[in-house]
UniProtKB/Swiss-Prot annotation:
Family: Belongs to the YihI family.
Keyword field contains Signal: no
Assigned keywords, A-Z: GTPase activation, Ribosome biogenesis
Protein species of origin: Photobacterium profundum (strain SS9)
Function, as annotated: A GTPase-activating protein (GAP) that modifies Der/EngA GTPase function. May play a role in ribosome biogenesis.
Feature: compositional bias, Basic and acidic residues: 18-33, 50-67, 77-88, 153-163
Quaternary structure note: Interacts with Der.
Superkingdom of the source species: Bacteria
Upper lineage: Bacteria, Pseudomonadati, Pseudomonadota, Gammaproteobacteria, Vibrionales
Protein name according to UniProt: Der GTPase-activating protein YihI
């Protein structure tokens, strides 16, 4: 493949067009491009510099951040009035409140009627009933259910004791098992 020598003559693009600028325009553009090149990074100065707010200025001067608040500080510690804590109800009072709880009674009636409660209501009923049971236990009002004593099952006539089973094992003919 032969190489074509390029000519300097006017090609398909037409003659080159040059715009002449005045020297002042060239100088201005050069200065601008140099400034842009110089300012590639961040501004110099304090990293934590905050934006200037108008409230920092007082009478046209910058407010010194080192000056503190003008709020007076008490030098003597004053005792704060203590608020009275709610008295906890005694176990008897709490038990009376729970037993007379209208909402609990309504929910128990609904359960007895065969209605199924939602998970939240059922959980609430269970918690209140557990609390009532706990309080009754603390007050000694809870009747402890005695487990019923079940009689041991009578020994069947055909049942073998441990000694009988041991004798049977010892008298077994083990040779007859392996010859099948």
């Amino acid at each position: 493949m032969t190489r074509k020598k390029r000519s300097r003559g006017v090609g398909s693009e037409g003659p080159a067009v040059f715009r002449e600028k005045s020297t002042t325009q060239v100088d201005v553009e050069a200065r601008k491009s140099q400034k842009d090149k110089k300012r590639k990074g961040l501004k110099s100065g304090n990293r934590n510099a905050e934006a200037l707010d108008p409230k920092h200025y007082a009478n046209g001067q910058k407010k010194d951040p080192r000056l503190g608040s003008k709020k007076p500080i008490p030098l003597v510690v004053e005792k704060k009035p203590t608020t009275k804590k709610e008295r906890r109800l005694s176990a008897e009072q709490e038990l009376d409140m729970l037993e007379n709880d209208a909402q609990l009674m309504v929910l128990l009636d609904r359960i007895e009627a065969g209605e199924k409660l939602g998970a939240g209501l059922q959980k609430q009923v269970d918690q209140k009933l557990d609390r009532i049971e706990h309080l009754m236990g603390r007050l000694g009002l809870l009747e402890v259910e005695e487990p019923e004593v079940t009689e041991e099952a009578p020994v069947r006539k055909g049942a073998k004791t441990d000694e009988d089973l041991l004798d049977q094992f010892e008298n077994m003919d083990l040779d007859s098992f392996g010859k099948e």
